[in-house]
Curated annotation (Swiss-Prot):
Name under which the protein is recorded: Photosystem II protein D1 3
Post-translational modification: C-terminally processed by CtpA; processing is essential to allow assembly of the oxygen-evolving complex and thus photosynthetic growth. Tyr-161 forms a radical intermediate that is referred to as redox-active TyrZ, YZ or Y-Z.
GO molecular function annotations of the record: chlorophyll binding; electron transporter, transferring electrons within the cyclic electron transport pathway of photosynthesis activity; iron ion binding; oxidoreductase activity, acting on diphenols and related substances as donors, oxygen as acceptor; oxygen evolving activity
Pfam families: Photo_RC
Keywords: Calcium, Chlorophyll, Chromophore, Electron transport, Herbicide resistance, Iron, Magnesium, Manganese, Membrane, Metal-binding, Oxidoreductase, Photosynthesis, Photosystem II, Thylakoid, Transmembrane, Transmembrane helix, Transport
Binding site for [CaMn4O5] cluster: 170, 189, 332-333, 342, 344
Positions bearing the site annotation: Cleavage: 344-345
Disulfide bonds: none
Site for Tyrosine radical intermediate, residues: 161
SUPFAM superfamilies: Bacterial photosystem II reaction centre, L and M subunits (SSF81483)
Assembly behavior: PSII is composed of 1 copy each of membrane proteins PsbA, PsbB, PsbC, PsbD, PsbE, PsbF, PsbH, PsbI, PsbJ, PsbK, PsbL, PsbM, PsbT, PsbX, PsbY, PsbZ, Psb30/Ycf12, peripheral proteins PsbO, CyanoQ (PsbQ), PsbU, PsbV and a large number of cofactors. It forms dimeric complexes. Precursor protein interacts with Ycf48.
Amino acid sequence: MTTVLQRREQLNLWEQFCSWVTSTNNRLYVGWFGVLMIPTLLAATICFVIAFIAAPPVDIDGIREPVSGSLLYGNNIITGAVVPSSNAIGLHFYPIWEAASLDEWLYNGGPYQLIIFHFLIGVFCYMGREWELSYRLGMRPWICVAYSAPVAAATAVFLIYPIGQGSFSDGMPLGISGTFNFMLVFQAEHNILMHPFHQLGVAGVFGGALFSAMHGSLVTSSLIRETTETESANYGYKFGQEEETYNIVAAHGYFGRLIFQYASFNNSRALHFFLAAWPVIGIWFTALGISTMAFNLNGFNFNHSVVDAQGNVINTWADIINRANLGMEVMHERNAHNFPLDLASAESAPVAMIAPSING
Protein backbone atom coordinates (compact mmCIF):
# COMPACT_ATOMS: atom_id res chain seq x y z
CA MET A 1 0.00 0.00 0.00
CA THR A 2 1.38 3.36 -1.01
CA THR A 3 0.55 6.55 0.87
CA VAL A 4 0.96 9.82 -0.99
CA LEU A 5 1.52 12.93 1.11
CA GLN A 6 0.72 16.25 -0.55
CA ARG A 7 1.70 19.61 0.88
CA ARG A 8 -1.32 21.79 1.53
CA GLU A 9 -1.33 24.78 -0.76
CA GLN A 10 -0.79 27.90 1.22
CA LEU A 11 -3.26 30.70 0.69
CA ASN A 12 -1.79 33.69 -1.02
CA LEU A 13 -1.68 37.05 0.76
CA TRP A 14 -4.85 38.42 -0.85
CA GLU A 15 -6.91 35.39 0.13
CA GLN A 16 -5.59 35.62 3.68
CA PHE A 17 -6.62 39.27 3.77
CA CYS A 18 -10.11 38.47 2.43
CA SER A 19 -10.52 35.72 5.01
CA TRP A 20 -9.45 38.04 7.83
CA VAL A 21 -11.70 40.90 6.69
CA THR A 22 -14.83 38.75 6.51
CA SER A 23 -14.15 36.58 9.57
CA THR A 24 -16.73 36.78 12.35
CA ASN A 25 -14.21 35.32 14.81
CA ASN A 26 -12.26 38.57 15.12
CA ARG A 27 -12.71 40.50 18.37
CA LEU A 28 -13.98 43.41 16.28
CA TYR A 29 -15.57 42.64 12.93
CA VAL A 30 -13.88 44.53 10.09
CA GLY A 31 -15.87 43.71 6.94
CA TRP A 32 -15.48 45.24 3.52
CA PHE A 33 -17.32 48.35 4.63
CA GLY A 34 -14.89 48.56 7.54
CA VAL A 35 -11.95 48.69 5.12
CA LEU A 36 -13.25 52.09 4.01
CA MET A 37 -14.79 53.10 7.35
CA ILE A 38 -11.62 52.86 9.42
CA PRO A 39 -9.40 55.25 7.40
CA THR A 40 -12.18 57.78 6.76
CA LEU A 41 -13.25 58.01 10.40
CA LEU A 42 -9.61 58.19 11.50
CA ALA A 43 -8.97 61.04 9.06
CA ALA A 44 -12.09 62.91 10.22
CA THR A 45 -11.26 62.41 13.91
CA ILE A 46 -7.60 63.44 13.63
CA CYS A 47 -8.43 66.54 11.57
CA PHE A 48 -11.25 67.49 13.97
CA VAL A 49 -9.02 67.25 17.05
CA ILE A 50 -6.23 69.30 15.46
CA ALA A 51 -8.64 71.91 14.06
CA PHE A 52 -10.57 72.21 17.33
CA ILE A 53 -7.33 72.85 19.19
CA ALA A 54 -5.25 74.92 16.81
CA ALA A 55 -7.05 76.01 13.61
CA PRO A 56 -6.66 79.74 12.79
CA PRO A 57 -9.75 81.95 12.35
CA VAL A 58 -11.95 81.28 9.30
CA ASP A 59 -13.58 83.85 7.01
CA ILE A 60 -16.95 82.11 7.25
CA ASP A 61 -19.06 84.89 5.67
CA GLY A 62 -16.57 85.61 2.90
CA ILE A 63 -16.30 89.29 3.87
CA ARG A 64 -12.73 89.26 5.23
CA GLU A 65 -13.86 89.10 8.85
CA PRO A 66 -12.45 85.81 10.21
CA VAL A 67 -14.20 84.02 13.07
CA SER A 68 -12.08 82.20 15.65
CA GLY A 69 -13.13 78.69 16.62
CA SER A 70 -10.16 76.86 18.14
CA LEU A 71 -8.95 76.59 21.72
CA LEU A 72 -5.60 78.26 21.03
CA TYR A 73 -7.38 81.30 19.60
CA GLY A 74 -9.34 82.21 22.72
CA ASN A 75 -12.17 79.67 22.91
CA ASN A 76 -13.09 77.09 25.53
CA ILE A 77 -14.81 73.71 25.24
CA ILE A 78 -18.25 75.36 25.09
CA THR A 79 -17.49 78.13 22.59
CA GLY A 80 -14.97 76.20 20.50
CA ALA A 81 -15.89 74.76 17.11
CA VAL A 82 -14.56 73.83 13.72
CA VAL A 83 -15.88 76.79 11.72
CA PRO A 84 -17.59 75.94 8.39
CA SER A 85 -15.82 76.76 5.14
CA SER A 86 -16.06 80.26 3.72
CA ASN A 87 -19.04 81.64 1.84
CA ALA A 88 -16.49 82.68 -0.78
CA ILE A 89 -15.93 78.98 -1.48
CA GLY A 90 -19.66 78.25 -1.68
CA LEU A 91 -20.33 74.69 -2.79
CA HIS A 92 -16.98 74.23 -4.51
CA PHE A 93 -15.04 71.13 -3.56
CA TYR A 94 -12.08 72.54 -1.63
CA PRO A 95 -9.37 69.96 -0.88
CA ILE A 96 -5.89 71.06 0.17
CA TRP A 97 -4.51 70.91 -3.38
CA GLU A 98 -7.11 73.41 -4.63
CA ALA A 99 -5.69 76.15 -2.39
CA ALA A 100 -2.65 78.23 -3.27
CA SER A 101 -1.17 77.55 0.15
CA LEU A 102 -1.96 75.81 3.41
CA ASP A 103 -2.59 79.19 5.04
CA GLU A 104 -5.21 80.01 2.40
CA TRP A 105 -6.85 76.61 2.88
CA LEU A 106 -7.07 77.17 6.63
CA TYR A 107 -8.31 80.76 6.22
CA ASN A 108 -11.15 79.56 3.98
CA GLY A 109 -12.16 76.75 6.34
CA GLY A 110 -10.87 73.79 4.36
CA PRO A 111 -10.72 71.50 7.42
CA TYR A 112 -14.53 71.65 7.74
CA GLN A 113 -15.03 70.06 4.32
CA LEU A 114 -12.33 67.48 4.99
CA ILE A 115 -13.99 66.48 8.27
CA ILE A 116 -17.61 66.29 7.13
CA PHE A 117 -16.89 64.41 3.90
CA HIS A 118 -14.75 61.80 5.63
CA PHE A 119 -17.20 61.63 8.54
CA LEU A 120 -20.22 61.07 6.28
CA ILE A 121 -18.44 58.39 4.26
CA GLY A 122 -17.41 56.79 7.57
CA VAL A 123 -20.92 56.67 9.05
CA PHE A 124 -22.36 55.40 5.75
CA CYS A 125 -19.81 52.59 5.88
CA TYR A 126 -20.61 51.92 9.55
CA MET A 127 -24.23 51.42 8.54
CA GLY A 128 -23.15 49.10 5.74
CA ARG A 129 -20.90 47.23 8.17
CA GLU A 130 -23.88 46.65 10.46
CA TRP A 131 -25.75 45.07 7.56
CA GLU A 132 -22.68 43.05 6.55
CA LEU A 133 -22.16 41.58 10.03
CA SER A 134 -25.87 40.78 10.32
CA TYR A 135 -25.66 38.97 6.98
CA ARG A 136 -22.59 36.97 8.04
CA LEU A 137 -24.29 35.89 11.27
CA GLY A 138 -27.60 35.03 9.62
CA MET A 139 -29.44 37.81 11.43
CA ARG A 140 -32.22 40.02 10.11
CA PRO A 141 -31.11 43.40 8.70
CA TRP A 142 -33.09 45.82 10.88
CA ILE A 143 -30.15 47.08 12.98
CA CYS A 144 -28.75 49.08 10.07
CA VAL A 145 -32.27 50.31 9.23
CA ALA A 146 -32.56 51.78 12.73
CA TYR A 147 -29.10 53.36 12.42
CA SER A 148 -30.19 55.00 9.17
CA ALA A 149 -32.16 57.57 11.20
CA PRO A 150 -29.17 59.38 12.78
CA VAL A 151 -27.26 58.91 9.51
CA ALA A 152 -30.07 60.69 7.66
CA ALA A 153 -30.08 63.48 10.25
CA ALA A 154 -26.30 64.00 9.98
CA THR A 155 -26.50 63.98 6.18
CA ALA A 156 -29.28 66.57 6.29
CA VAL A 157 -27.41 69.14 8.40
CA PHE A 158 -23.92 68.59 6.96
CA LEU A 159 -24.66 68.00 3.27
CA ILE A 160 -28.26 68.51 2.10
CA TYR A 161 -28.82 71.82 3.89
CA PRO A 162 -25.60 73.45 2.59
CA ILE A 163 -26.44 72.27 -0.93
CA GLY A 164 -29.93 73.75 -0.70
CA GLN A 165 -28.64 77.06 0.70
CA GLY A 166 -25.83 77.29 -1.83
CA SER A 167 -22.80 77.26 0.48
CA PHE A 168 -21.06 75.03 2.98
CA SER A 169 -20.80 78.09 5.21
CA ASP A 170 -24.45 77.37 6.08
CA GLY A 171 -23.60 73.89 7.39
CA MET A 172 -23.71 73.14 11.10
CA PRO A 173 -20.49 74.15 12.92
CA LEU A 174 -18.68 71.34 14.71
CA GLY A 175 -19.00 72.57 18.28
CA ILE A 176 -21.44 73.08 21.14
CA SER A 177 -22.20 76.80 20.79
CA GLY A 178 -21.95 76.47 17.02
CA THR A 179 -24.71 73.87 17.09
CA PHE A 180 -26.92 76.17 19.15
CA ASN A 181 -26.21 79.05 16.77
CA PHE A 182 -27.17 76.81 13.84
CA MET A 183 -30.45 75.93 15.56
CA LEU A 184 -31.35 79.55 16.31
CA VAL A 185 -30.56 80.74 12.78
CA PHE A 186 -32.46 77.79 11.33
CA GLN A 187 -35.52 78.79 13.36
CA ALA A 188 -35.15 82.41 12.27
CA GLU A 189 -34.90 81.60 8.57
CA HIS A 190 -37.17 78.56 8.26
CA ASN A 191 -39.52 78.58 11.29
CA ILE A 192 -38.65 74.93 11.96
CA LEU A 193 -40.68 74.79 15.18
CA MET A 194 -43.82 75.20 13.08
CA HIS A 195 -42.87 72.44 10.61
CA PRO A 196 -44.94 69.24 11.02
CA PHE A 197 -41.96 66.99 10.26
CA HIS A 198 -39.92 68.55 13.06
CA GLN A 199 -42.86 68.11 15.40
CA LEU A 200 -42.96 64.42 14.45
CA GLY A 201 -39.25 64.23 15.25
CA VAL A 202 -39.80 65.76 18.69
CA ALA A 203 -42.56 63.22 19.33
CA GLY A 204 -40.20 60.47 18.17
CA VAL A 205 -37.29 61.45 20.42
CA PHE A 206 -39.27 62.29 23.54
CA GLY A 207 -41.72 59.46 22.98
CA GLY A 208 -38.87 57.02 22.43
CA ALA A 209 -37.25 58.11 25.68
CA LEU A 210 -40.56 57.73 27.53
CA PHE A 211 -41.27 54.28 26.06
CA SER A 212 -37.71 53.13 26.78
CA ALA A 213 -38.01 54.21 30.42
CA MET A 214 -41.45 52.59 30.73
CA HIS A 215 -40.22 49.32 29.22
CA GLY A 216 -37.06 49.18 31.31
CA SER A 217 -38.88 49.93 34.54
CA LEU A 218 -41.62 47.37 33.81
CA VAL A 219 -39.09 44.64 33.04
CA THR A 220 -36.97 45.48 36.09
CA SER A 221 -40.07 45.41 38.27
CA SER A 222 -41.25 42.02 37.03
CA LEU A 223 -38.02 39.99 37.12
CA ILE A 224 -38.37 36.32 37.97
CA ARG A 225 -36.37 36.00 41.19
CA GLU A 226 -33.82 33.20 41.13
CA THR A 227 -31.86 34.40 44.16
CA THR A 228 -32.43 34.83 47.88
CA GLU A 229 -33.61 38.06 49.44
CA THR A 230 -30.06 38.87 50.51
CA GLU A 231 -28.69 38.76 46.95
CA SER A 232 -29.26 41.03 44.01
CA ALA A 233 -31.92 39.81 41.59
CA ASN A 234 -29.43 40.50 38.78
CA TYR A 235 -27.33 37.52 39.90
CA GLY A 236 -30.21 35.23 38.99
CA TYR A 237 -29.60 35.74 35.28
CA LYS A 238 -27.18 33.54 33.36
CA PHE A 239 -26.04 34.71 29.94
CA GLY A 240 -27.63 32.53 27.27
CA GLN A 241 -30.26 31.00 29.54
CA GLU A 242 -33.35 29.60 27.83
CA GLU A 243 -35.83 30.65 30.50
CA GLU A 244 -37.56 34.01 30.47
CA THR A 245 -35.85 36.54 32.69
CA TYR A 246 -39.03 38.51 33.47
CA ASN A 247 -42.74 37.81 33.67
CA ILE A 248 -44.31 39.53 30.66
CA VAL A 249 -47.78 38.47 31.82
CA ALA A 250 -47.29 40.33 35.11
CA ALA A 251 -45.95 43.41 33.30
CA HIS A 252 -48.86 43.28 30.84
CA GLY A 253 -51.36 42.97 33.66
CA TYR A 254 -49.86 45.85 35.61
CA PHE A 255 -49.70 48.26 32.69
CA GLY A 256 -53.11 47.25 31.38
CA ARG A 257 -54.65 48.09 34.75
CA LEU A 258 -52.62 51.28 35.10
CA ILE A 259 -53.95 52.76 31.86
CA PHE A 260 -56.29 50.41 29.96
CA GLN A 261 -56.02 46.88 28.64
CA TYR A 262 -55.15 47.58 25.02
CA ALA A 263 -52.44 50.11 25.88
CA SER A 264 -50.24 47.17 26.89
CA PHE A 265 -48.50 44.80 24.49
CA ASN A 266 -49.03 41.07 24.97
CA ASN A 267 -46.51 40.18 22.26
CA SER A 268 -42.84 40.73 23.08
CA ARG A 269 -41.83 40.90 19.42
CA ALA A 270 -44.44 43.51 18.55
CA LEU A 271 -43.42 45.49 21.64
CA HIS A 272 -39.76 45.63 20.70
CA PHE A 273 -40.56 46.48 17.08
CA PHE A 274 -42.62 49.41 18.34
CA LEU A 275 -39.79 50.57 20.63
CA ALA A 276 -37.42 50.61 17.65
CA ALA A 277 -39.80 52.00 15.03
CA TRP A 278 -41.21 54.96 16.97
CA PRO A 279 -38.01 57.04 17.37
CA VAL A 280 -36.57 55.90 14.03
CA ILE A 281 -39.59 57.04 12.04
CA GLY A 282 -39.68 60.32 13.98
CA ILE A 283 -36.02 61.08 13.24
CA TRP A 284 -36.54 60.10 9.60
CA PHE A 285 -39.23 62.75 9.39
CA THR A 286 -37.00 65.36 11.01
CA ALA A 287 -34.22 64.64 8.52
CA LEU A 288 -36.76 64.91 5.71
CA GLY A 289 -37.97 68.21 7.13
CA ILE A 290 -34.43 69.63 7.26
CA SER A 291 -33.90 68.47 3.69
CA THR A 292 -37.04 70.24 2.45
CA MET A 293 -36.34 73.41 4.42
CA ALA A 294 -32.87 73.37 2.85
CA PHE A 295 -34.64 74.42 -0.36
CA ASN A 296 -36.77 76.96 1.56
CA LEU A 297 -39.96 74.92 1.80
CA ASN A 298 -40.34 76.25 5.31
CA GLY A 299 -42.55 75.66 8.32
CA PHE A 300 -45.97 77.26 8.62
CA ASN A 301 -45.93 81.01 9.04
CA PHE A 302 -48.58 83.34 10.35
CA ASN A 303 -47.13 86.60 9.10
CA HIS A 304 -50.59 88.18 8.78
CA SER A 305 -51.72 89.00 12.28
CA VAL A 306 -55.26 88.55 13.55
CA VAL A 307 -57.08 91.91 13.51
CA ASP A 308 -60.41 93.05 14.89
CA ALA A 309 -63.13 94.98 13.06
CA GLN A 310 -61.27 98.27 13.58
CA GLY A 311 -58.03 96.86 12.20
CA ASN A 312 -56.28 96.61 15.54
CA VAL A 313 -53.85 93.70 15.90
CA ILE A 314 -54.90 90.96 18.30
CA ASN A 315 -51.56 89.62 19.51
CA THR A 316 -51.13 85.85 19.40
CA TRP A 317 -48.21 83.53 20.03
CA ALA A 318 -47.59 83.62 16.27
CA ASP A 319 -46.76 87.34 16.52
CA ILE A 320 -44.31 86.63 19.34
CA ILE A 321 -42.64 83.89 17.29
CA ASN A 322 -42.40 86.20 14.27
CA ARG A 323 -40.80 88.92 16.38
CA ALA A 324 -38.33 86.44 17.89
CA ASN A 325 -37.45 85.12 14.43
CA LEU A 326 -36.74 88.63 13.17
CA GLY A 327 -34.58 89.34 16.21
CA MET A 328 -32.50 86.23 15.69
CA GLU A 329 -32.16 86.94 11.99
CA VAL A 330 -30.94 90.47 12.70
CA MET A 331 -28.25 89.20 15.10
CA HIS A 332 -26.61 86.61 12.88
CA GLU A 333 -24.18 87.57 10.12
CA ARG A 334 -24.48 91.09 11.46
CA ASN A 335 -21.83 92.51 9.11
CA ALA A 336 -22.84 90.58 5.99
CA HIS A 337 -26.15 92.41 5.62
CA ASN A 338 -27.83 95.34 7.32
CA PHE A 339 -31.34 93.93 7.54
CA PRO A 340 -32.83 90.45 7.54
CA LEU A 341 -34.34 89.42 4.23
CA ASP A 342 -37.87 89.74 5.59
CA LEU A 343 -37.33 93.41 6.40
CA ALA A 344 -35.22 94.26 3.37
CA SER A 345 -37.85 92.94 0.93
CA ALA A 346 -40.94 94.36 2.62
CA GLU A 347 -42.66 97.62 1.81
CA SER A 348 -41.13 100.58 3.58
CA ALA A 349 -43.05 101.67 6.66
CA PRO A 350 -43.34 105.38 7.47
CA VAL A 351 -41.57 106.31 10.66
CA ALA A 352 -42.76 109.95 10.84
CA MET A 353 -46.12 111.27 9.69
CA ILE A 354 -45.12 114.96 9.74
CA ALA A 355 -41.80 116.47 8.81
CA PRO A 356 -40.23 118.07 11.87
CA SER A 357 -39.84 121.82 11.92
CA ILE A 358 -36.28 122.98 12.28
CA ASN A 359 -35.57 126.24 14.00
CA GLY A 360 -32.46 127.58 12.41
